[in-house]
Amino acid sequence: MTEKKNRREKKNPREAKVTFEGLVTEALPNGMFRVRLENDTIILGYISGKIRSSSIRILMGDRVKIEVSRYDSSKGRIIYRLPHKDSKRIEDSKDSEDLKDITDSKD
């Protein structure tokens, strides 16, 4: 009897997910977004039910936490929108690098 019980125990489904931080680059219909992760991969993100029911707005340029499955790394669930003061702007750093390159080439 105890052997069957051990076989039926379910593992925590959250263990199969990895959490990343990313930047929303494009808003798509039906609560879908393109998100650029910290490692520069772009994935499709959808809003979790808790965020949807709380009516939290997610816009382009927002930093978000996203859960990605280990089995399908092309899609993820947006679980948290980071406050603007805590977020470091990836776009700003890349734009400033581009500006430095342009000004260096003019000299």
UniProtKB/Swiss-Prot annotation:
Subcellular location as annotated: Plastid, Chloroplast
CDD domains given in the database record: S1_IF1 (cd04451)
Gene Ontology cellular component annotations, sorted alphabetically: chloroplast; cytosol
GO molecular function, a single term: ribosome binding
Transmembrane region(s): none
UniProt main location, coarse: plastid
Domain S1-like, residue spans: 8-83
Keyword Zinc-finger: no
InterPro entries hit by this protein: NA-bd_OB-fold, RNA-binding_domain_S1_IF1, S1_domain, TIF_IF1
Pfam families noted in UniProt: eIF-1a
Claim: rRNA-binding is one of the keywords in the record: yes
Keywords associated with the record: Chloroplast, Initiation factor, Plastid, Protein biosynthesis, RNA-binding, rRNA-binding
Role this protein plays: One of the essential components for the initiation of protein synthesis. Stabilizes the binding of IF-2 and IF-3 on the 30S subunit to which N-formylmethionyl-tRNA(fMet) subsequently binds. Helps modulate mRNA selection, yielding the 30S pre-initiation complex (PIC). Upon addition of the 50S ribosomal subunit IF-1, IF-2 and IF-3 are released leaving the mature 70S translation initiation complex.
UniProt family annotation: Belongs to the IF-1 family.
Assembly mode: Component of the 30S ribosomal translation pre-initiation complex which assembles on the 30S ribosome in the order IF-2 and IF-3, IF-1 and N-formylmethionyl-tRNA(fMet); mRNA recruitment can occur at any time during PIC assembly.
HAMAP family: IF_1 (MF_00075)
Protein's name in the database: Translation initiation factor IF-1, chloroplastic
Organism encoding this protein: Lolium perenne
Taxonomic placement: Eukaryota, Viridiplantae, Streptophyta, Embryophyta, Tracheophyta
